[in-house]
Amino acid sequence: MGLDMYIVKKDKAAGPLSDENYDDSNDVAYWRKFNALHGWFVEHIQNGVDDCGSYEISKEQLFDLLEVLEEAYALKDASKLPPTPGFFFGSYEVDQWYWDKVASARDTISSLIDDTDWEKYKLYYFASW
């Protein structure tokens, strides 16, 4: 039990992501208990609503997130990506584990931006706990 976070890729022709057609998507990113990153998605993608729903992510939104991750890591400034409280969300400490997660997420998001065929696919974020 805990915060599990996913980005999935789905062919645009297959329609929006839903419980009924989830099997038609591919997981392209996964994080466990990285509550600071989840908080960013809730505030910037989910309009402040933390409801375990799936939300489409644009290339521009990923660029915004990449900028936050790069600045936070370069400046070692956790205020750019603050820990987010929640039930079974993991540690709220800003320690080496946190910075390792920021660096890993930065690399993952950069790869998603570069490697996604944006004409053919949509990306969606969702989390469960």
Task: Give residue ranges: language-model regions.
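Acidic (Asp/Glu-rich) sequence patches and key acidic residues
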Residues: 1-129
